[in-house]
């Protein structure tokens, strides 16, 4: 089942967004992402201690922003062209997840009565779209590479023996990061974990060799879900202060009901 609008484009934002806040100033991170055979998009991520802003384009081509408040556990999806926004709490995410899980159970029950060939086609069509708990990715270091200005350690990631991911990482000090910079990224991943478990662990984060099988900060991430591959590369990182308005909905924007098309 596809994630319903306006949340379909949020999936990509979550994968890009979980980036580190600064200890003494905010952090601006610029990444470029290509999904499938689509055009390359540039994403700007602005972070402070408990706040995150992700700028991107919606599928309709409008200018969109995701605003995450880690303290209040609220995400706001802003459409700047339409001057509208929707607001989503953790309770909203859990309720939506429960509804999706119910639909998934009904579909799986219906599939039991399909002819084998039809059931196989439906299972393939549904692959990667359901919100089932994913198998943990196991990473293996396979060498080194160069991404932009950085020489990085390359890892291949596997689920059930199948390669589904590639990472290229650098020591966080190379980018000026400390472990505390990644706390808000953990909050974002947990916020959406039940709704989008296949993306919750695919965020920009600090690797821990013991827990995750890789070390360092990914400057390149490649993930495959079903037949779709998403490639994200870090292009720029700077520390700078942000005004409070960076993480707020612009004045005069109209709130829409949750689930309305942005």
Place the predicted regions along the sequence by residue.
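Residue-level detector of alpha-helical transmembrane segments in integral membrane proteins
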Residues: 1, 13-14, 243
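Positively charged n-region of N-terminal signal peptides that target proteins for export
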Residues: 1-8
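Bacterial N-terminal signal peptides
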Residues: 8-19
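Extended soluble regions of mature proteins
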Residues: 24-262
């Amino acid at each position: 089942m596809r994630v319903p609008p306006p949340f379909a484009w949020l999936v990509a934002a979550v994968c890009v967004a979980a980036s580190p806040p600064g200890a003494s100033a905010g952090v601006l991170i610029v990444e470029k992402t290509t999904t499938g055979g689509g055009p390359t998009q540039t994403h700007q991520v602005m972070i402070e201690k408990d706040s995150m802003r992700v700028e991107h384009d919606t599928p309709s081509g409008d200018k969109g922003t995701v605003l995450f408040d880690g303290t209040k556990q609220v995400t706001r999806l802003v459409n700047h062209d339409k001057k509208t926004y929707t607001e989503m709490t953790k309770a909203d995410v859990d309720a939506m997840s429960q509804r999706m899980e119910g639909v998934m159970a009904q579909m799986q029950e219906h599939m039991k009565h399909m002819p084998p060939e039809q059931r196989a086609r439906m299972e393939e069509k549904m692959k990667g779209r359901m919100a089932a708990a994913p198998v943990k990715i196991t990473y293996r270091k396979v060498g080194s590479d160069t991404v932009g200005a950085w020489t990085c350690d390359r890892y291949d990631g596997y689920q059930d023996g199948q390669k589904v991911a590639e990472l290229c990482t650098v020591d966080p000090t190379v980018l000026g990061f400390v472990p505390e910079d990644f706390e808000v990224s953990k909050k974002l991943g947990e916020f959406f974990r039940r709704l989008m478990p296949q993306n919750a662990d695919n965020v920009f984060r600090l690797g821990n060799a013991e827990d995750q099988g890789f070390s360092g900060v990914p400057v390149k991430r490649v993930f495959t879900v079903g037949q779709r591959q998403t490639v994200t590369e870090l292009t720029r990182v700077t520390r700078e202060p942000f005004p409070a308005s960076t993480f707020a909905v612009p004045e005069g924007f109209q709130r829409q009901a949750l689930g309305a098309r942005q």
